[in-house]
Design a protein with these regions (language model features):
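N-terminal Rossmann-like NAD(P) cofactor-binding subdomain of oxidoreductases
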Residues: 1-190, 226, 290-291, 295-300, ...
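Charged docking surfaces used in two-component/phosphorelay signaling
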Residues: 67, 157-330
Length: 330
């Protein structure tokens, strides 16, 4: 099997390399692609030094079975035809094709069969916040249909890229030295702050990030589920957290929910409030699963349930999910 990584020098591209190394897929050849800035760099994979090739409109993808792409929506749109025209299946981490009717949007724990129906040979990876939420929601959906969801996200700096992480560290150092903090990657200072603004605002005053959770959840779950999201950037380096409230068709008890989560694929239950056992990004960064805790009945609605979930958005929220899609196809 011949695999390509497009955008290998980015945070998700580097995670692709690590995950492919860890999971020992039957890869005969791995080809790395990048921009002019990245071309010529070398990375080690399974003991070999691999040189990054410049991504160009040519026949470099001929003979490649799967391409894992994470180079931004603009690059994905520009190069999709180049990547797929010789039969390569493109598993794309960007937002470019997620809502296209003829492109499946896949989370393997939820809708793996959708990956097998990709007429354009493009499969889209959902947004990181959607991925971790639907993995958890699937456990409850299997018990009783979910009518609606309210979710507030607590998204780490790394969700905005490596430069954003560096800026957060710089801000803390500058403030500690009594200096004015550098603000470039975020709308405001993130250190000692939270910012209820991720991506641009739309006409309905929700951000694009929030509307992604609405549209993507419905597509992945093949459901009329209603989703209202508030997405917030928090001064955490890695791993996203979500506070989720949902309403089901019939009441679901806490014990039922715990049992469902404990059996769900891709979920780890951490739910012992009395023992201070609950998921936190400090301990979840670098892990593969969606961690669920703080499960409780809603006090205002008989059919309401609330929980808290945390997941590493670079692994399960991006690179790992794409590799799992690949694994469903081989």
């Amino acid at each position: 099997m011949k695999i390509a990584i497009v955008g290998v020098s980015g945070a998700v591209g580097q995670e692709f390399l690590r995950i492919l190394e860890e999971r020992r897929l039957p890869i005969d050849e791995l080809v790395l692609f990048g921009s002019e800035r990245s071309a010529g760099r070398t990375y080690k994979f399974r003991g070999k030094e691999l040189t990054v090739k410049l991504l160009q409109h040519n026949d470099d993808f001929k003979g490649i079975d799967f391409a894992l792409t994470s180079a931004g929506a603009g690059t994905s749109k520009e190069f999709a035809e180049t990547i797929t025209r010789h039969g390569t299946v493109m598993i794309d981490n960007s937002s470019a094709f997620r809502m296209d009717a003829d492109v499946p949007l896949v989370v393997p724990e939820v809708n793996p069969e959708d990956a097998k129906n990709a007429p354009r040979r493009i499969i889209a990876n959902p947004n990181c916040t959607t991925i971790q939420m639907v993995v958890a929601l699937k456990a409850i959906e299997d018990v009783s249909h979910i009518r609606r969801v309210h979710v507030s996200t607590y998204q780490s700096a790394s969700g905005a890229g490596a430069a954003a992480m560096a800026e957060l560290e710089t801000q803390y150092a500058e403030l500690g030295a009594g200096k004015e903090p550098t603000v470039a990657k975020f709308a405001f200072q993130l250190a000692y702050n939270v910012i209820p603004h991720i991506d641009v605002f739309t006409d309905n005053d929700y951000t694009k990030e929030e509307m992604k959770m609405f549209h993507e959840t419905r597509k992945i779950m093949h459901s009329d589920i209603a989703v209202s999201a508030t997405c917030v950037r928090v001064p955490v380096m890695r791993a996203h957290s979500e506070s989720v409230w949902l309403e089901t068709e019939r009441p679901v008890s806490v014990s039922e929910a715990r049992e469902a989560f404990s059996k769900a694929e891709g979920v780890v239950l951490m739910d012992d409030p009395a023992g201070k056992v609950y998921p936190m990004p400090l301990f979840i960064a670098g892990k593969d699963s969606v961690y669920v805790g703080r499960i409780r009945k809603d006090l205002t609605c008989d059919n309401g349930l609330a929980f808290w979930c945390v997941s590493d958005q670079i692994r399960k929220g991006a690179a790992l999910n794409a590799v799992q899609i690949l694994e469903t196809l081989i």
